[in-house]
């Protein structure tokens, strides 16, 4: 997963489940920023799926 990747929120425990966004910043190996329609949030890569 790298900056600019198109991702979908796949964690069903997340309020943003199913939303599609773009990785905007990688903080470290454990967290990334993703811009989704609801805003820009920090996610764990395990809760995201690269789709493009």
Language model regions located:
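Basic/aromatic-rich interaction segments and small domains that mediate binding to polyanionic partners
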Residues: 2-52
């Amino acid at each position: 997963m790298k900056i600019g990747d198109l991702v979908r929120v796949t964690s069903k425990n997340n309020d943003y489940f199913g939303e599609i966004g773009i990785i905007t910043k990688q903080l470290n190996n454990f967290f990334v920023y993703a811009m989704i329609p609801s805003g820009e949030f920090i996610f764990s890569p395990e809760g995201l799926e690269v789709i493009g």
